[in-house]
Structures are given as C-alpha cells and as structure tokens.
C-alpha cells in the first residue's frame, strides 16, 4: 500500500522516487509535503541535483552536493525571497540576522519555484 506524502488537493506531481525514501524518513507524524522544487544548479552554477520541500511544519532542503539535509521550522521573521537573472533563478531563505540558505535553478523550474514560494508563505501565515 502506497501512502501519499502530499497533502490532499496538492497540484504538484508526486515526488520523484529518487527522493521519496529520504523525505519519508524525515517527516514527523502528521507532517505532509505542501510543495517541492527539484533544483538543478549548485552554488557554482554547475548542473547538480538538489531538493527543497515545504511541509506543513517547516522547510527542508538537500543542497546539490551536500551530504546532509537542513531544516528550518516556520517562525515569525522567516522569509523566502525569489529572484531571477540571466536564466538563473534563486531562492534565498532569510531571517532578521541574514541569509540562512540559498538555492539556484534554471528558469525551466521557475513555475515550480513560485508554487513552492506560495506554499511556504501560506504555511508561514497559518
């Protein structure tokens, strides 16, 4: 029996199998995925795979080339900034002290990045 990790009514296609096992082991009881973005550039703008996930409780990320996952619980003052320049999109997670994380992707993923941003903002506001 397969259990969906996505919230009911989530428009995103299902999470790629290559990430599913890693995400399942990190979700707390009752925590579901609201949106996700498979990124395709590392910090040097070289092609590499990573994943950013907005859940009902937090933002999870596995940066390209990183050996570990990072996690940030939703809290006041946390923001996800979006911008693009010259074919490269950037999402930056920031708080009052500064940048916490940054992820880059080719603009072919921009629509999905905007969905992730919207899900993040909705969860942060709830």
Feature locations, PLM:
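Phosphoinositide-binding peripheral membrane targeting modules
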Residues: 39-88
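Anionic N-terminal interaction surfaces
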Residues: 1-51
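Short polybasic amphipathic segments
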Residues: 89-95
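Canonical phosphoinositide-binding patch of PH/PH-like domains
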Residues: 95-116
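Short, charged, intrinsically disordered terminal tails
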Residues: 5-9, 118, 122-126
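Short hydrophobic/aromatic-rich beta-strand segments that constitute the beta-sheet cores
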Residues: 59-63, 93, 102
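Generic detector of well-ordered alpha-helical segments enriched in charged/polar residues
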Residues: 20-24, 114-121
């Amino acid at each position: 029996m397969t259990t969906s990790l996505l919230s009911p009514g989530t428009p995103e296609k299902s999470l790629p199998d290559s990430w599913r096992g890693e995400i399942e082991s990190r979700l707390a009881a009752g925590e579901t995925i609201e949106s996700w973005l498979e990124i395709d550039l590392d910090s040097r703008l070289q092609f590499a795979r990573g994943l950013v996930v907005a859940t009902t409780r937090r933002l999870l990320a596995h940066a390209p080339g990183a050996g570990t996952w990072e996690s940030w619980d939703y809290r006041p003052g946390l923001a996800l900034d979006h911008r693009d320049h010259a074919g490269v999109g950037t999402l930056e997670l920031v708080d009052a002290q500064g940048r916490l994380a940054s992820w880059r992707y080719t603009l072919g993923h921009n629509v999905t990045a905007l969905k992730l941003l919207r899900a993040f903002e909705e969860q942060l506001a709830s």
